[in-house]
Curated annotation (Swiss-Prot):
It is found in: Cytoplasm. It holds the Pfam family Peptidase_C54. Its main location: cytoplasm. The modification N-acetylmethionine is found at M1. Belongs to the peptidase C54 family. This is Cysteine protease ATG4C. One of its GO terms (cellular component) is cytoplasm. Its EC number is 3.4.22.-. Keywords: Acetylation, Autophagy, Cytoplasm, Hydrolase, Phosphoprotein, Protease, Protein transport, Thiol protease, Transport, Ubl conjugation pathway. The modification Phosphothreonine is found at T452. Transmembrane segments: none annotated. PANTHER family: CYSTEINE PROTEASE ATG4, CYSTEINE PROTEASE ATG4C. The active site is at C111, D345, H347.
Length: 458
């Protein structure tokens, strides 16, 4: 009886936190963001310059866009469509209870897990759909209607679907391969893309069996001493994402892996080994890899000398974003203009959407408006992500990133490095992972160290 009373108190507490959180952040979501027409805007390796939106696609040299072979003029609508097409993952409420707790929301503590999900989602978008893909309905999302993004309206989206369900919901991730699903649409490119689009979002659903959903990520976090309701930092989330992808058994995910840099060092042979690992299918191609590099951009505060480095990273075609934020808040950084970073904010709490339902609503998984913040406000602790489709792509990326690191760094040493060979060649002990424990002892030590260094999340 006492336990029941405690659960009720916890539920009331979470409802209050969600309501307070939305009151705090909803005005931010609805506030207009202003962009200059005189400076280029970079979004995950694509350059837009609104000053030339009515002109030819070739920009003049003084425009500021210098990404070879990837320069586009792009008008405002093209930029909006590109931004809105990125997958937005936020706090949710009223989802199935997290095992071992009374929590049915991540409001107040799950923001870095959400920004990590957004980075991984962008990597999967590149893997399955490519950087040129945009959601056809992106511009149908209106940000001017202040009611559009309230929790009440989100419930309207799901109400019609709930009416079709009887009895207790079953939360499950479809096991049919994407290739099987889209087979009959092989001549319909748009249908193929839409199937992948929905499938990727479903992998991040807030149900226990969603491959990269909050419930699963928390389970992997338990192996490092984390639990639901704890604060997670960018480096810890990087390792959790790696484990989630490694453990995913979905046939469509056997061609991608994640590598997490050790002590700001990417060991080229270790990455290539992961990409060349035997695949479960008949496809003998190299695996794609998402490289995650946890770094600190200074001591207590971000060193402004790293501004050009961050801008250089976000200008690369290989970049899938940065898990970062400002003190007490985690954001997903996806671009910049001048000295301001462009980001997506996970702090707005939306209602649970059951992604196992056919044609579930997509609107709440796409952010209607970009936000900007000064680089000076950025917390120094962050994790940078890159995507490479195969071994050759990785080799090109490592060369290009190394050049960028040298040119953008005012420090004597680059923020991170690519080195030839394996980590074991540099006196790192290679530990075999216990089958009963997803994290090795070395990984646990790393995770505990990272968790004490990183900022507190709201």
């Amino acid at each position: 009886m006492e336990a029941t009373g405690t659960d009720e108190v916890d539920k009331l507490k979470t409802k209050f936190i969600s309501a307070w959180n939305n009151m705090k952040y909803s005005w931010v979501l609805k506030t207009k963001t202003y962009f200059s027409r005189n400076s280029p805007v970079l979004l995950l390796g694509k350059c837009y310059h609104f000053k030339y939106e009515d002109e030819d696609k070739t920009l003049p040299a003084e425009s500021g866009c210098t990404i070879e072979d990837h320069v586009i003029a792009g008008n405002v609508e093209e930029f909006r469509k590109d931004f809105i097409s990125r997958i937005w993952l936020t706090y949710r409420e009223e989802f199935p209870q997290i095992e071992g707790s009374a929590l049915t929301t991540d409001c107040g503590w799950g923001c870095t897990l959400r920004t990590g999900q957004m980075l991984l989602a962008q990597g999967l978008i590149l893997h399955f759909l490519g950087r040129a893909w945009t959601w056809p309905d992106a511009l149908n999302i209106e940000n001017s209607d202040s009611e559009s993004w309230t929790s009440h309206t989100v419930k309207k989206f799901t109400a019609s679907f709930e009416a079709s369900l009887s009895g207790e919901r079953e939360f499950k991730t479809p096991t049919i391969s994407l290739k099987e699903t889209i087979g009959k649409y092989s001549d319909d490119h748009e249908m193929r893309n839409e199937v992948y689009h929905r499938k990727i979002i479903s992998w991040f659903g807030d149900s226990p069996l969603a491959l990269f959903g909050l419930h699963q990520l928390i389970e992997y976090g338990k192996k490092s001493g984390k639990k639901a309701g704890d604060w997670y930092g960018p480096a810890v989330v990087a390792h959790i994402l790696r484990k989630a992808v490694e453990e995913a058994r979905h046939p469509d995910l056997q061609g991608i892996t994640i590598y997490v840099a050790q002590d700001c060092t990417v060991y080229n042979s270790d990455v290539i080994d992961k990409q060349s690992a035997s695949m479960t299918s008949d496809n003998a191609d190299d695996k794609a890899v998402i490289i995650l590099v946890p770094v600190r951009l200074g001591g207590e505060r971000t060193n402004t000398d790293y501004l050009e480095f961050v801008k250089g990273i976000l200008s690369l075609e290989y970049c899938v974003g940065i898990i970062g934020g400002k003190p007490k808040q985690s954001y997903y950084f996806a671009g910049f203009q001048d000295d301001s970073l462009i980001y997506m904010d996970p702090h707005y709490c939306q209602s649970f959407v059951d992604v196992s339902i056919k044609d579930f609503p997509l609107e709440t998984f796409h952010c209607p408006s970009p936000k900007k913040m000064s680089f000076r406000k950025m917390d120094p602790s962050c994790t940078i992500g890159f995507y490479c489709r195969n071994v050759q792509d990785f080799k090109r990326a490592s060369e290009e990133i190394t050049k960028m690191l040298k040119f953008s760094s005012k420090e004597k040493y680059p923020l991170f490095t690519f080195v030839n060979g394996h980590s074991r060649d540099y006196d790192f002990t290679s530990t075999t992972t216990n089958e009963e424990d997803l994290f090795s002892e070395d990984e646990k030590k790393q995770l505990k160290r990272f968790s004490t260094e990183e900022f507190v999340l709201l």
